[in-house]
Structures are given as structure tokens and as C-alpha cells.
């Protein structure tokens, strides 16, 4: 039975006039659902009064178990109990195999590249597992609120790529949820703290969850949230702290690292319990089998220090990307259960020179903020005015051009939603089709970027090279999902694609791509210039050869032809090398020695066009 909500006079939520919408934090370790009740955003409890739902799903032959009971069965039934499924969202089968023994499951492949977990209930994809968690949250919300939901705002890490976001939307659809918006977790946290109404200036959102780390720098101005930069590590979280403590136990106890799935789960649960105990205690007794030892907070801090340092390095990079200084940041919001670790809080305070905001439960803050946004998007009037959320894309989007070059159409950290168009042309005479290769990344060469999709534009009118104009439009919606369209402007023929890869980036790939873009920036620029010079030279060679085939014998004498042939041979040889300056100079020389030939061809074309026409016809 739904509980009756009693409000103070003048604060009634007018239930019959409000549309029911919720915010959902679909987390790696835990998940929550929240909603606005009596004007306040709060997490919704289950029948036992618990607001946190462990992100654990256990499959039986005839039923599915979700939450705390499933989590407790993980050691006894590791092959049928799925934990931390968020880490598998948008991944390929080859990606999860690289994780090796970290995942005690049997994986099988499907028709898509998506990994399936082999259970007694049959193969289960990460999308299906996530959907089972979302179904429980949806049912909890509808029972508590006493009605059917019009939709939900689901939060995702700011660093989630296109495939991971799409997988999240697919899971929601499977769970019977209408997704009003995918909202970046850092932005949701800022909304929860009411920073949209009370703050002006720069805010850092430090989000360390079970499986991912995000850092976002936001500028708040009059209710407008502008995300200046995002960063993080998609392979850093509380799970990694657990694995580190588990490694310490194995080493200290002299155990074999080759454990069966049940023993592995049991070990990780022991490590997690020790980590959580050290949040309040200075020392904890750790027992595993017949072995036991003391683990001090000081020793634990030393174990996790490399990971804490990695998070701070990402913070400094995000601050640099946003064009501000650390001391300019006015507030730091802590998000995610792993920010309860004292060393994490101390390190963040030291880095930013101020104590972080921790008043709202870090496990609940994201869902609370998402619920506020959901209520607004559902069409309910929000006290205190509207807020505008301006999120950004984490990596540049572009396409392949001749020479294997990456041409950026939308740079990283561009505010979304966004649409950008750029004009391109054909490379060869008579070209009637063009392959559009959609890429993501920061490097200059396509071999160093990630391929998202390919599609072909056909029906381009046959023209000389460079005459056709193809407009390529990239559009990223508010959920961070990309669609690309190409249109030939003269004929109107067009083609488009919604980019929906079957799997996403591997662990840490986004962070690695950003790191590489800085590390190899100089080399990339040199390589790009070389490729461009090679393409220009090749284009000139083909154009000259085409002209020679048509008019060479008629308009050139033997000596002129020999000079041009020699210059062409020299340029053709230089293109095979890596001396960009020499290619550029030889291209200029070939262009100069063919100037007279080009002028004669132009004269011949004009004479042919005017042949048989009188002056009066021309004046008309």
C-alpha cells in the first residue's frame, strides 16, 4: 500500500497535478531511485526501509534475485551471481577477456560483439542484467509513489562513451522505463547540493564510485551549469581498492593467487569489509581461513596511494583543460561511496586547498540530483526557477580524410547538445560515392583514433575532382549520443547513420587517448603535415597525368613533355619518403613547370566554347 504524504500548508505537492518521474543512480556497487516528495528530493526505500539496492543479480533456473540476498550468495554461487555489471556495459567480448581472473564468470559470444554471461537461466548480456536491477527500482518507485512513472533520469559517468550510454538506454527500455535524459553523475551531484540556486563560480565534482572515477569542473552562473571539462579513469574505483587489499592478504598469508571463483569472491568480500572498517577504525583484524593479521589505516593508505595519486592527476588535467587554476575552484563536491575513505578526503582537501562538501550521503547524492532534474523534465513546475544543464563530450569526434588523417568536426569538451557541419569534396574525377568513416579521439592519424562507424554516400554527380560539395553534419543529443548525416549539395542525395557500436572503449582507453594526445602532439602534427603534403602531391600528379593523356601530344613539344615527365618522376619518388619539405618544394616545381600547359588548355577550352558563336549571342 502506498504511504500517504502529509505536507505543511502551502507546500502540498498537488499529487493529482504532478507527473511522476524519478532519478536513478545505476551504480557499479549500489543503485538507488529517488523522487521529489513534498518538495524535497529523497531516495525511495524498499519494504524493509532500505534505500540502497546492491547492484547484484543472482539467476536461478526459475527466478531472478536482485539486491542484498543476491550479493550474500556471491561466494556460494559465483557463476550465477553477477556483481559490478556496470563495468561490462558497452564492452566487447575481447575486452572482458582481457580482464582475466578479475571476473569469475563464464563468458560466451553472441551474434553481436557483446559478451554474454553463461548462467543456469541461459546467457545474459550486461544490458539484461542491468535491466533486472532497473526493474526492481521501477517497481519500488511505482509502489511508493502510488502510480505509473512517466519517465526517469538515469545517471551515467561523465566518461561513459557512446556505446556505454546506448547500452544504458537499452537496459532502461528493457526494464519498461522511459528515459527522459541520461545525466552525467557529476552534474547531478551539483544539482543535489542546490548549487544551481545558491552558487556562482567554479565547482569541482570528485566522483569515486565502485568501478569508475570522474572529475568534472563546472561553472555556475545564474542557474546555468556549464561543464568546462571532464576527466577521470574508467578503471579506477572502490573495487580496485578491494583487489589491492586482497593482494595484500594473498601475499601476507602466503596463499596461491590461483583461486577458484568461490574463494576469490570470499577473499574480495573480506578485503571490502576491512576497507569499510578502516573508515572509522585505526586498525582492523583481517581473517581469512586460518590466517589472521592486523591491517592499520596507515598501511591501507600506503596500499591505495598509487590509485589516489592517479585520481589527483586526472583532477589536475581537468583543471588545466578548463583553463583555470586549482585555487580558482570555490567548492569541491564528493560523490560515490569510495569517497568515505579518509585518505581520499584528505588528499582531495590537500590538492584543492579546501575541505570538500560531504554533507549529503555520497551514495545518495547523485540519485537525489537526478530526481530534481527528472521532475523538471516531466513538466512539473520547480520552485526556485529552472536550471539549464550544459554537459560536454569527453573526446573529439571527426572523420577520415585522404591520407588516413583525422579531421575533427566537434572538439572535446564541446557543450552538448550540439550540431556541427563541415564541407568536404571528392578526390578523384568522376567520383560518385564517398565512404564516411566516423572517428573518436585526439590524435592526428586515424590509426591512433577509435573507429565508431562507417557509411557510404552514393549518387554523387560525376564531376572533376574537387567540384562536388558534400556537407557532413555531426549531431550529439543531450544524452551524448551521436548521429551523422552526409548530403551532396547540388543533387540533394544524402545518407545518415545513428552511431550505435556494439561495444565500447576498453578499460582506461579514453584516459589513454587523452594522455597520448598530449604526449605525441608534436609527432602527430609532423605526421599530419607529411600526410597532407603527400595527398596534395598525389592529387597534382593525377591531375597532370590526366591532362597529359588528353592534350599532351597536341599542346606540348618533346622538350616540354620531357621536363614535365622528369619533375613528375621525382615527385612520385619523394612521396614514398618522409621528407615533407622536399615533397612541398617539388610539388611547387611541378606546378610551376605545368603552368604554361594549363594556360594553353584553358585557351583551347575557351576557343572551343566560343566556336561558331557571334558577338550578339555573347552579349545576350
Curated annotation (Swiss-Prot):
Keyword Chaperone in record: yes
Keywords: ATP-binding, Chaperone, Nucleotide-binding
UniProt KW ATP-binding keyword: yes
Molecular function via GO: ATP binding; ATP hydrolysis activity; ATP-dependent protein folding chaperone; unfolded protein binding
InterPro entries in the cross-refs: ATPase_NBD, Heat_shock_70_CS, HscA_NBD, HSP70_C_sf, HSP70_peptide-bd_sf, Hsp_70_fam, ISC_FeS_clus_asmbl_HscA
PROSITE patterns with a match to the protein in the record: HSP70_1, HSP70_2, HSP70_3
Family membership noted in the UniProt record: Belongs to the heat shock protein 70 family.
Name by which UniProt lists this protein: Chaperone protein HscA homolog
Taxon lineage: Bacteria, Pseudomonadati, Pseudomonadota, Gammaproteobacteria, Pseudomonadales
Annotated gene: hscA
